[in-house]
């Protein structure tokens, strides 16, 4: 077996593990969302992730945390945390698979914002991916009487803001290593979300506290596995594995809440995943750091 094939298999393993961890995080957040409000969930998820992430960064010392791009880190954090608020609110309203699929459809919107904000050329493949993806999202939303479920639309907003965060990461990709981006994102999100969390703070049970600690742990290690996976294998080659999170989310929803999806929605899921894979492969020559947006 060639070195390239070994790297591809190892990269796929890291990514599948990462998305299993992140889908498990989603399940824990859904447990907490039955009692806790979204501002608290967003803050606790970031705070506990930061507590876990800091020791790892200082022990490994993979890169300096000093940066000259603080403004861009703030923009990336502002767009990323907006996506997070939308996603975590949605996760308490929709079945887990729906919330995850809609929020992780960001690659579909990326070519549009790359064209508008970075003046990147949009090729035919990327254009088709956007159109196919939007069709899939409409099928998943399943409009009733001409009106979309507002909760599902918030999930789409999560994907849109996540794609904007990817754009800001791309603008930093020449100077900022992935570990530094992850550090500033987690730090700034913890600080930004602390204020609304303080305003809306409420008592929580031991179960919810443990769920949030677990979510922070899974988020931190999920991000680290993502970074590792994309560092050893070409993003365009391993792009299909990112949608394993939808399968894991569907499994958790079925096991824990007996959530099921019908045939029509299942077809929409497949269409969105295919569109996301096409969009990712169409941009596979971009820097690997573009791919590591994690809500």
Give the positions of each predicted feature.
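Membrane-interface helix-cap regions at the ends of transmembrane helices
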Residues: 2-5, 50-69, 135-147, 189-208, ...
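Hydrophobic transmembrane alpha-helices of multi-pass small-molecule transport proteins
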Residues: 125-141, 162, 264-283
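Transmembrane alpha-helices of multi-pass small-molecule transport proteins
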Residues: 10, 35-82, 161-164, 184-199
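Transmembrane alpha-helical segments that form core, pore/gating elements
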Residues: 27-30, 38, 53, 144-204, ...
């Amino acid at each position: 077996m060639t070195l390239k094939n070994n790297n591809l298999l190892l990269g796929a393993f890291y990514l599948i593990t990462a998305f299993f961890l992140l889908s498990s995080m989603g399940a824990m957040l859904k447990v907490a969302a039955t009692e806790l409000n979204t501002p608290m969930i967003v803050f606790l998820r970031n705070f506990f992730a930061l507590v876990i992430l800091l020791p790892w960064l200082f022990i490994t010392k993979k890169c300096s945390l000093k940066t000259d791009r603080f403004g861009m880190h703030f923009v990336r954090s502002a767009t990323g945390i907006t996506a997070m608020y939308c996603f975590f609110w949605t996760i308490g309203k929709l079945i887990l698979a729906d919330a995850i699929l809609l929020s992780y459809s960001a690659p579909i919107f990326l070519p549009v914002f790359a064209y508008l904000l970075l003046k990147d050329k949009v090729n035919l493949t990327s254009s088709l991916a956007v159109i196919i993806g939007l069709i899939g999202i409409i099928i998943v939303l399943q409009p009733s009487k001409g009106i979309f479920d507002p909760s599902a639309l918030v999930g789409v907003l999560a994907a849109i803001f996540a794609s904007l965060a990817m754009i800001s990461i791309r603008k930093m990709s020449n100077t900022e290593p992935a570990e530094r981006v992850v550090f500033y994102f987690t730090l700034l999100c913890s600080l930004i979300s602390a204020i609304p969390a303080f305003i809306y703070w409420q008592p929580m049970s031991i179960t919810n506290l443990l769920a949030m600690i677990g979510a922070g742990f899974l988020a931190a290690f999920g991000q680290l596995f993502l970074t590792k996976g994309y560092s050893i294998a070409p993003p365009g080659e391993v792009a299909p594995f990112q949608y394993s999170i939808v399968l894991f989310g569907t499994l958790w929803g079925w096991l824990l809440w007996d959530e099921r999806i019908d045939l029509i929605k299942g077809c929409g899921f497949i269409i969105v995943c295919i569109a996301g894979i096409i969009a990712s492969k169409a941009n596979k020559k971009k820097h690997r750091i573009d791919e590591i947006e994690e809500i």
